[in-house]
Amino acid sequence: MPBKKPAAENKVEKAAEKTPAGKKPKAEKRLPAGKTASKEAGGEGKTRGRKKGSKAKKGVETYKIYIFKVLKQVHPDIGISSKAMSIMNSFINDIFEKLAGESAKLARYNKKPTITSREIQTSVRLVLPGELAKHAVSEGTKAVTKFTSS
């Protein structure tokens, strides 16, 4: 009874038989079980191993790289633990949600379909306390001016 083996094993055996003594057969790419190459001769092309029509898995978006950049601007010699980074990321997400919610309320109240920098500025004044709000507004105004001038 003939031995039924997967096609990949047959190719390796045939390559080993045909090579002259002293030369090693070319190593073939091994794929995980159940996977096949998207093109013949191992070329993956533009799909990068994904099936046609399938979407790439979206990673979780965080503010970690931006927190780290600001930390290095302020204190270049200090690091941050992963737990502290996670807390900072949660803090920024929380503030963002509060400001977005307040801005949406303001836009709805004024019967406007769009949240503009004016709604954001007002929501910053409402959400953040005293001196922190003043500083945030001045930094935000500076950032918007820089953005519009470039």
Curated annotation (Swiss-Prot):
Claim: Repressor is one of the keywords in the record: no
Role of this protein: Core component of nucleosome. Nucleosomes wrap and compact DNA into chromatin, limiting DNA accessibility to the cellular machineries which require DNA as a template. Histones thereby play a central role in transcription regulation, DNA repair, DNA replication and chromosomal stability. DNA accessibility is regulated via a complex set of post-translational modifications of histones, also called histone code, and nucleosome remodeling.
Name used for this protein in its record: Histone H2B.2
Positions carrying N6-acetyllysine: K4, K29
Note: Phosphorylation of H2B was not detected.
InterPro entries listed in its UniProt record: Histone-fold, Histone_H2A/H2B/H3, Histone_H2B, HISTONE_H2B_site
Lineage of producing organism: Eukaryota, Viridiplantae, Streptophyta, Embryophyta, Tracheophyta
Modification after translation, per record: Can be acetylated to form H2BK6ac and H2BK33ac. Monoubiquitinated to form H2BK143ub1; may give a specific tag for epigenetic transcriptional activation.
